[in-house]
A protein has these predicted regions:
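Feature for long, exposed domains in two main contexts
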Residues: 1-285
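Short alpha-helix capping/helix-loop boundary micro-motifs
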Residues: 136-138, 307-317, 536, 765-767
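Short acidic low-complexity segments
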Residues: 130, 142, 534-543, 766-773
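ASCE P-loop NTPase motor cores of helicases and related translocases
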Residues: 209, 354-552, 670-732, 738, ...
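Conserved helicase motor core of SF1/SF2 NTP-dependent helicases
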Residues: 469-472, 481, 500, 541, ...
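Pre-ATPase regulatory/linker segments immediately N-terminal to the P-loop/RecA-like helicase/translocase core
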Residues: 164-166, 170-437, 489-490, 502, ...
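Short, charged beta-turn/beta-strand-edge "cap" motif at the junction between a beta-strand
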Residues: 157-161, 332-337, 557, 786-787
Length: 958
């Protein structure tokens, strides 16, 4: 323990010998201290105010200024290769002379990057004699400081490399020592080009206003406009009920009390009310989140037959506004006590920062430019109603199907040898196909497919075998997103060994999907509206029963029920990426079409990304856990009984050194790398990575976290620049741009990197969040972790580092690379998380680290970041703290806190929930610089038989 002659929480004066900067905990407070090793270690300027802020009254008679004072909480910036200097004053405020024995650079990071001088460093205009007389060194000689006098010296920083430069300067005054720490952030032209000219302003969460505009008075007129054309569909055989939220349960949930249906947890007896209550929680949260769009005294602009409304920051908000959502408008000049009508319209199109609206013609006829309105948005509830309907239908399912652990009869599947259609099946894949073909109903059969193990190949083989060898089979294939469903269709129809007739296969699409969104070669398998061939439609019952294979999203499967297809119509139901869907979403295809003899196959990986949930309460009770994950926790599946589950373990994607860490952390070391040896790539980057035989590189960069405008999403310009440098190097060595992908947790970092690539590279390289890369792969993956500081508050102690602390996101991120994985980040920050810490030292041990100095190697356990949670708890969790009342959704796929302290909360990102391929395809079709960025979260839908968003899948239903 060190002794202090004087101490404050903002500055220190020391009586010990030369020491280095570190940190020690005192009564739960972290304070800067000095230790006896000549190494200042990592100093977090954003976290420890004592580094740069002090009270002169606590300093004693000698007052030393802080070099390179922070500007707006950030270090001063300088371009790499240049030198920046700053004066340091040493003032004697006493009445006695004091001896300044020495001033020394105690330590610098990078080494020797700071120097001292008694002369101001020369400028470009200095004369030659001054330049020759200038001397700089790492220490200054002793001198006497007279009473009331001030000595000015100069501290210079030579910008050696990009990133944070730090120094500790020691002043020995009589018997005391004073330390000052200086920070300089070094950038280059790339990072400087990404500088924001918009200071960050914390966005405020809007609250409901004008209550009577949302709750019409008795007799108050509501004038409804027409719905978007695509939402107008013909009547279905079965009408969907409203499923309005009962007022009693709404009051219980809004009072934060626990509903009776949740007290016992999920049981076989309360299945339906349990999940209906969780959906109500989710819907109430969505209602509340939609209030962020409420606006007063706004104006509409006319655009053709539409009115437009500017919605600033539209792309950054969650839940997002989409076509089909509802808007209620009221002239602002009318007070709340009159009975003026309310105008109810719909969103017809969503653009960058405006929405196109259409109301009843009455409003359009009297509207004039400059008229003022109060408006509120409502989400379309149709998707939620589909989920309620599916849950009600699940009441007829067998208990042994939903809860196989309660079954007294263990299943025994009889298999027969088969002739593979694909000659490349391995032992586990072949076994899974044989089991599926031998199933005769009962509990779901699970194909657990970790990254790169050929899950799609296995499903395709099973479907083709059924189609070819069992003529009476009728198959429903569902995936969580349009792209995933299209991928399965492509695999089926491109298998030349089986001649699939076009009239046997239907690719069912929601009417809201754009025809331009699907590959032209798949259009022959789709159904279109008879009057408008640019609009998808669902065939009528008489046509549906002729198909042997129907492929759709989970949500669109509800169309089949609406057309009257009965339970038991399908002999086999295949649910791909089942771990990404909430349990109610899974019930859409299952509860409507399962009978005792129906074979249900769930394929996916519970150790990767799961469903996206807005309500943290609903998520904590189990809505964030997929049906597949819940089954995997039960007896037969957990024990690996081959009559219930097959685990694929042979990975054909990743190099063995890329695969070894996720295999150890998430799959009990079972995964086996079967990737063919690379002969080209190690030679290609042998001069780029320290160890060409170990293609997992960690590049240590101490950048700075920044935000801009009213956007709470974080970005790190220094890391963005490093990403561009790496890509330029790789392309120079012959790597194709389409073989490179960049993953980063924050939407703003996605945009910054995309902008820099467009400016300095010009190639089409995909940049996106983890969610946008699930199911995809690249030869080279670069991960930018962004965060460069930790805030020591209670929220961070509970929730750690947000994105960095979500194990499933980590797993997906590091398993997208086939041949080379490069992680770029601050090692002193990422080492606080158990999994990222292991990746860091995995690289160090493999002699594949370069960059800034490393932290001390420590084993980081679960306790470091708080109690580890199951995926259902981790996914979309409050990850970086903050208060719920100030949360805002950002497109990076994360809930980001909009508190001034900069902590994130929510799901990605930092992970307050995530971005996901689902919404981009079905809801917004957002595009950045030529590529589609997946977006996050799902919303319910509105009244009528229009198109709607299904929560957790991000799909449109009709």
């Amino acid at each position: 323990m060190l002794n202090y002659s004087e101490q404050s929480n903002k500055g220190f004066r020391f009586t010990s010998l030369y020491y280095s900067m570190g940190s020690v905990n005192f009564d739960d407070e972290t304070r800067s201290v000095i230790s006896d090793v000549g190494d200042i270690g990592n100093v977090d300027f954003a976290n420890d105010a004592s580094c740069y802020n002090y009270d002169p009254s606590n300093e004693g008679p000698i007052v030393v200024s802080v070099p390179f004072p922070l500007v707006d909480g950030k270090p001063q910036f300088v371009v790499v290769g240049e030198t920046i200097f700053n004066s340091v004053t040493i003032e004697n405020t006493s009445t006695d002379a004091v001896t300044l024995w020495s001033v020394e650079i105690y330590d610098s990071k990078p080494k020797d990057s700071f120097t001292l001088s008694v002369m101001e460093p020369p400028s470009p205009g200095s004369d030659e004699e001054y330049i020759k007389s200038f001397v700089e060194s790492f220490s200054l000689e002793d001198r006497t400081l007279l009473p009331g006098k001030t000595l000015t010296i100069w501290l210079s920083c030579k910008a050696m490399v990009k990133g944070l430069h730090t120094t500790a300067v020691h002043f020995t005054v009589d018997d005391d020592k004073i330390e000052r720490v200086g920070f300089v952030m070094v950038e280059d032209k790339i990072s400087r080009s990404l500088t924001s000219n918009k200071p960050y302003n914390r966005p405020m969460r809007n609250k409901p206003f004008i209550p009577k505009i949302f709750s019409p008075n008795a007799g108050q007129k509501v004038i409804r406009g027409s719905r978007p054309a695509k939402a107008n569909s013909r009547p279905r055989k079965y009408r969907l009920l409203e499923y309005k939220i009962p007022m009693a349960i709404r009051e219980v949930i809004e009072s934060k009390a626990t509903p009776d249906s949740l007290v016992e947890g999920l049981t076989e007896k309360n299945y339906v009310p349990f999940f209906k209550t969780l959906l109500i929680m989710e819907e109430i949260k969505l209602e509340d989140d939609m209030r962020t769009y409420d606006m007063q005294n706004i104006t509409f602009k006319t655009k053709g037959r539409f009115l437009t409304l500017e919605v600033l920051g539209l792309a950054e908000r969650r839940p997002s506004l989409v076509t089909g959502d509802i808007i209620i408008a009221k002239p602002a000049s009318h007070n709340d006590h009159n009975m003026s009508p309310l105008y109810k319209g719909h969103i017809f199109r969503v653009e960058a920062e405006e929405v196109l609206l259409q109301f009843h013609e009455e409003l359009h006829s009297f509207h004039s430019e400059g008229d003022r309105y109060d408006v509120q948005f409502e989400y379309n509830r149709l998707g939620m109603r589909r989920l309620y309907q599916a849950l009600e239908a699940s009441g007829k399912l067998d208990t042994e199907f939903l809860f196989p652990e309660f079954s007294s009869n263990e299943r025994l599947i009889e298999t027969r040898p088969l002739v593979p259609i694909s000659c490349n099946l391995n032992e586990e894949q072949l076994s899974a196909v044989e089991m599926i073909l031998g199933c005769k109903g009962g509990p779901p059969y699970i194909v657990h497919g970790p990254p790169g193990t050929g899950k799609s190949v296995t499903l395709t083989e099973a479907i083709l075998q059924l189609y070819k060898t069992k003529r009476n089979t009728v198959i429903l294939v569902c995936a969580p997103s349009n792209s995933a469903a299209d991928h399965l269709l492509g695999r089926l129809v491109m298998e030349n060994a089986v001649n699939i007739r076009k009239e046997d296969v239907l690719r069912l699409n929601a009417t809201a999907r754009s025809v331009d969104d699907i590959k032209s070669e798949f259009l022959d398998f789709c159904s279109f509206d008879q009057e408008d061939t640019t609009v998808f439609s669902c065939p009528i019952f008489e046509q549906l029963i002729r198909y042997r294979i129907i492929i759709s999203t989970y949500a669109s499967a509800a169309l089949l029920c609406a057309e009257g297809l009965p339970s038991g119509h399908f002999t086999h139901i295949f649910l791909d990426e089942a771990a990404q869907a909430s349990e109610p979403e899974t019930m859409i295809p299952v509860s409507h079409f399962y009978r005792r003899n129906t074979v249900v196959v769930l394929a996916g990986d519970p150790m990767q990304l799961g469903p996206v949930i807005f309500s943290k309460d609903a998520e904590s009770y189990g809505l964030g856990k997929s049906f597949m994950e819940r089954l995997c926790e039960s007896k037969f599946y957990k024990d690996g009984d081959q009559n219930y589950v097959t685990k694929l373990v042979r990975n054909y994607r990743c190099h063995q050194h890329i695969l070894s860490l996720p295999s150890e952390l998430f799959y009990k070391g079972d995964l086996v790398s079967c990737k063919e040896d690379d002969t080209l790539y190690p030679l290609t980057w042998k001069d780029f990575i320290p160890n060409p035989e170990f293609p997992v590189l960690f590049m240590g960069v101490q950048g700075v976290d920044e935000r801009e405008g009213n956007n709470p999403s974080w970005f790190n310009r220094i890391e963005a620049s490093e990403v561009v440098d790496v890509i330029l190097n790789l392309i120079d060595k012959g790597i194709k741009s389409e073989d490179i992908g960049v993953i980063t947790p924050y939407r703003q970092q996605v945009l910054k990197i995309s902008k820099a690539l467009e400016t300095f590279v010009g190639s089409d390289i995909k940049v996106g969040t983890v969610e946008s890369f699930q199911g995809q792969e690249r030869e080279v993956i670069i991960v930018s972790t962004v965060r460069s500081t930790i805030k020591h508050n209670e929220t961070d102690k509970r929730h750690c580092l947000g994105f960095l602390s979500n194990p499933r996101r980590f797993n997906v991120a590091i398993t997208r690379a086939r041949s080379l994985l490069i992680a770029i980040g601050n090692p002193h920050i990422i080492c606080k998380d158990e999994h990222w810490n292991k990746l860091l030292w995995h690289c160090v041990d493999g002699e594949s680290y370069k960059g800034c100095f490393l932290p001390e190697k420590e084993e980081v356990g679960e306790g470091e970041c708080g109690e580890q949670r199951s995926y259902g708890e981790w996914n979309n969790k409050w990850e970086e703290g903050g208060e719920e009342s100030s949360g805002a959704w950002v497109p990076s796929g994360d809930w980001e806190n909009v508190n001034d302290n900069g902590n994130d909360w929510g799901v990605e990102e930092e992970t307050g929930s995530k971005q996901n391929e689902k919404e981009v395809e079905s809801r917004e079709q957002t595009s950045y610089d030529g590529w589609k960025e997946n977006e996050m979260k799902n919303k319910g839908e509105g009244e009528g038989e229009g198109s709607a968003w299904v929560p957790s899948s991000g799909e449109w239903a009709m």
